[in-house]
Amino acid sequence: MGDQPFIPPPQQTALTVNDHDEVTVWNAAPCPMLPRDQVYVRVEAVAINPSDTKMRGQFATPWAFLGTDYAGTVVAVGSDVTHIQVGDRVYGAQNEMCPRTPDQGAFSQYTVTRGRVWAKIPKGLSFEQAAALPAGISTAGLAMKLLGLPLPSPSADQPPTHSKPVYVLVYGGSTATATVTMQMLRLSGYIPIATCSPHNFDLAKSRGAEEVFDYRAPNLAQTIRTYTKNNLRYALDCITNVESTTFCFAAIGRAGGHYVSLNPFPEHAATRKMVTTDWTLGPTIFGEGSTWPAPYGRPGSEEERQFGEDLWRIAGQLVEDGRLVHHPLRVVQGGFDHIKQGMELVRKGELSGEKLVVRLEGP
């Protein structure tokens, strides 16, 4: 299938960070070139992640585009693409604020897909629903990889079974990453147990948690040790502060185990030598590494690129089959000013158990 006769406009609207480190709507932003192995997308909906709100200072490339999660309509395909056609709907992730590709970010009118970190939107799934998935899929997959746990098999009728229950503690079980991860853990045969606020217990259980605990309950680490018969080996920390790290280390069983967080964790709270530690870095899913400041800088990796491709092949099938579902949504209709306003809501932590999605209506 050759290139389609779509000519990008000379300028587009995008959300960026200017020379003064201010988030701004740029109405004269450039449009990206179309690589031979990718597709050109008119962005219809975007989701806002906490990471989007942190792209300032040393993390910002002035005038590069913001945004990770997008869903949209294919308007052109590269000459090497054979499985997608104009008019198809796709969703995926971008490596925002990447200095090598400053004109590729989700918060823009047009974007091009990146690597194989994207998939077709199944029938019955809206743009808004699809836009809520990419960062969660990518981070959940990276977390499972770092914990040493296998990804689900999309062809298996039933999850694999273990001779004994294998529990995985998910601290912050009502976050968007947690709800995707718990579903994937279930599909891989593991048993998630979660902590969150009581008003989100039903959400965590609906996304795979076997049991949910109030994170403020007294002596909770001991309660979880008792619940898991002191055999908990895996903990995923979706909050990552001194309290969450300390708690996870206390809940892991006497034989030790593995702790993974979504951000660099406070090392002074990692108090047990029998517990291995790591943390996820979103851009590694593309295999491109990261140019962010220490400790986030990372070289590119072919192994990580291949993992990202495998993950998205699996996750895309699970979404298509209805076995992997999105986080509850708070949808806003509007333009790029609404994305900017939504970023402030997310930055201030004003959402609980919801993913903020903006359905684009225009600049």
From Swiss-Prot:
The reaction(s) catalysed by this protein are: holo-[lovastatin nonaketide synthase] + 9 malonyl-CoA + S-adenosyl-L-methionine + 11 NADPH + 19 H(+) = dihydromonacolin L-[lovastatin nonaketide synthase] + S-adenosyl-L-homocysteine + 9 CO2 + 11 NADP(+) + 9 CoA + 6 H2O
* Annotated disulfide bonds: none
Q: What is the effect of changing S138M?
A: Reduces catalytic efficiency
Indicate which residues the UniProt annotation says bind NADP(+): 51-54, 174-177, 197-200, 215, 262-263, 280, 351-352
The Gene Ontology terms for molecular function here are:
enoyl-[acyl-carrier-protein] reductase (NADH) activity; lovastatin nonaketide synthase activity; NADPH binding; oxidoreductase activity; oxidoreductase activity, acting on NAD(P)H; polyketide synthase activity
Pathway membership: Polyketide biosynthesis; lovastatin biosynthesis
Question: LovB-binding: where is this region?
Answer: 226-272
Subunit details for this protein? Each MAT domain from the lovB homodimer binds one lovC molecule to form the final active lovB-lovC megasynthase complex.
Q: What is this protein called?
A: Lovastatin nonaketide synthase, enoyl reductase component lovC
Q: Which gene encodes it?
A: lovC
